[in-house]
Amino acid sequence: MDGHADKNNEVETAGGHRARLRRRLLDAGPKAFHDYELVEYLLALTIPRVDTKPLAKRLLHDFGGIGPLLSASADTLRREGLTDPTIAALKIADATALRLLESRIKDKPVLSSSDALGEYLHAAMAHARVEEVRVLFLNAKNMLIANEALWQGSVDEASVHVREVIARAIALSATAIIIVHNHPSGDPSPSNQDIRLTRDLVEAGRHMKVTVHDHVIVGVEGRTSMRAMGLI
């Protein structure tokens, strides 16, 4: 009987804590929450009658922060023992945040929204564990036509990638592009391959009347602009 009573007390305590979190969220907004409380609340949506604070803190510790946690793949999260409903709750939060940031660079000239663009690119790519190359295709007014991840992996095969990027730009009737890729190491410094790819893209684009505005490298330590470095 005592064990059953203790269990009921735990459930009631967890329920009361969640109600207090919900009230604080509605009254003060998400800025009043620590990262672990945001994750705790997300976990509580799919893990009933359990105190999710310890799990939230463990996940943040294991992944190194809320960004790497939310951007982790479903398979990686499963290896942490999370169920699919819980993984879906984390991924929908990640997708919503990215969609919000992406909305800030739509319907306006991308080059005049550099801060918003940087925030979006960092959120979308900085915490990825594999290298990804993304291209922003722009029209003559530098408005975003398409935002596409073209490939994952090394940029070593520069000539193949150059043809793919320029061909896609022509197919979309884009007049300019911004190429972006991440460094999973965290260091956004360009490699020799990055510099070579940039120069090859600029040259190929010139022949096909596609302007390469920039090549941005993103890492958890920051981001690097090839144009700002004088490489374009």
Give the positions of each predicted feature.
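Long, highly charged, low-complexity intrinsically disordered interaction regions
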Residues: M1-T76
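Short acidic/polar active-site loop segments enriched in Thr and Asp
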Residues: K31, T175-A176, T211
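Small-residue hinge/turn detector
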Residues: T83-D84
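Short HxH-centered metal-ligating active-site micro-motif
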Residues: Q152-S191
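Divalent-metal-activated hydrolytic enzyme cores
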Residues: R199-I232
